[in-house]
Amino acid sequence: MREMFRAGVAALALVLAPALPAQTTPASAAKTTAAAPQTALAPAPLSELAASVALKHDSFTLPNGLRVVVHTDRKAPVVAVSVWYHVGSKDEPLGKTGFAHLFEHLMYYGSENHDALFFEPLESIGATDANGSTWFDRTNYYETVPTSALDLALFLESDRMGHLLGAVTQAKLDAQRSVVQNEKRQGDNAPYGLADYAILEGLFPAGHPYRHDTIGSMADLNAASVADVHAWFKANYGPNNAVLVLSGDIDVATAKPLVAKYFGDSPSGPTPARFE
């Protein structure tokens, strides 16, 4: 997790860093013939790059606001299931740094109708690539399952989207807080581990939502409470703040009734603020 964060910060620094001034050569070492000037090519706007990606897909939206994207690929009898929530570390209020990532961990430790480890039933049916991640702008959860086990994956994802809080306990919060803090210690003590913080502070001004790293501070993690978990879930984990992506051995005609069956009863949450 921390390695992914470090790679992302490094890439962000390359994108945002101003162009370096051209190196100058002392007159005594200058060549007698001047080199031909080079014209730098401006990068294409992100909107153009996104538009150039042509991946056939269908999409629809449930009445509760859940957006669904379906891409059909029949090469193998598997379906990749991915849920993207439009919330990340940029949404953390002052004094709550690291909470988006801490909450991601809690999502794997039981929901109201499956109060057990999220991974256990997936492993029993041969799922692969089951994991999650947190970044500035989003938190995502994903797994690839046999087509015959798609119902199970949708049930598990929908239960933690709509029915999580009844399974959250102080003991679970304390356990995952410890796990996240150990991740932080491991990252901080790795070579150049503290460089991440300096890079973000150098790139973004005080008060910018990207200025603090996703792992958060020890003090803020220690202060996280079950009440904070409830507030974060209610504010950010409604279906209207998420996108469900199904890719593989499935089509939109099959997906619509399945998604409605499992996600249709999840109530919409408030409309979160958007940073532009």
Report each predicted region and the residues it spans.
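Active/ligand-binding-proximal structured segments within catalytic/core domains
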Residues: 65, 74-119
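Mature N-terminal segment immediately following signal peptide/propeptide cleavage
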Residues: 43-89
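Bacterial N-terminal signal peptides
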Residues: 8-21
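Structural beta-strand/beta-sheet cores of well-ordered domains, especially the beta-sheet scaffolds
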Residues: 5, 58, 79-81, 104, ...
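Charge-rich, well-structured scaffold segments of protease-associated domains
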Residues: 2, 13, 23-25, 30-31, ...
